[in-house]
A protein has these predicted regions:
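Basic, polyanion-binding surface patches
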Residues: 1-185
Length: 185
């Protein structure tokens, strides 16, 4: 038997993105967003409303980074979604995060979060709240690599459970993509 919930924002895993951009004075700001993902090979799409300070900053600077929130920084990443940059201009400082300027786009990279997708703005539609960025680079700290490749266990990204308003860390490897299903060919 199944239980029907009606229309919900229930997709698993739902990523927890930390989106960062500079304001017109070069001050870094960031926010937590869960509605987003890869929309084309070198594009990322995120749904964020135009009243966010981060949205304003992205529209001004034409660039942003998307870091994966991690289990080590759940509280800090949650705070970035609770506090408004319109009211708290030093959110990153308050939660202890530090930034460096991306080598590839005019946007901040958060040092404490080991993976960042560095993007240039392609478009923003205020009606649908859809922001689209061209992926220019993905940078990953050595602490999240094994043999030069991203190690998901070391990265320890979290996902958002919209039913229960919880965060969960991604689990163990269960198979090999584009390989395990070959037995059915």
């Amino acid at each position: 038997m199944r239980k029907n919930f009606g229309p919900k924002t229930a997709v698993y895993p739902m990523p927890v993105f930390i989106i960062a951009a500079y304001d017109e004075n070069g001050v870094a700001n960031a926010m937590n967003a869960a509605w987003g993902g890869i929309s084309e090979e070198k594009e990322i799409s995120i749904c964020i409303s135009e009243d966010h300070k981060t949205t304003y900053n992205i529209l001004h600077s034409k660039a942003f980074t998307v870091s994966m929130a991690t289990a080590d920084f759940v509280k800090e990443c949650d705070y970035l979604g609770i506090a408004s940059g319109n009211k708290v201009p030093n959110k990153l400082e308050i939660c202890g995060f530090h930034t460096d300027k991306s080598e590839f786009v005019n946007a901040p990279v958060i040092r404490e979060l080991p993976m960042a997708v560095e993007c240039e703005l392609i478009s923003y539609d205020p009606e649908s709240c859809r922001l689209v960025g061209r992926i220019v680079n993905v940078s990953v700290d050595d602490s999240a690599l094994t043999d030069g490749k991203v190690d998901v266990a070391k990265l320890s990204p979290i996902c958002y459970d919209s039913f229960n308003h919880d965060y969960h860390v991604l689990g163990a490897k269960v198979g090999n993509a584009f390989s395990d299903g070959k037995e059915f060919l």
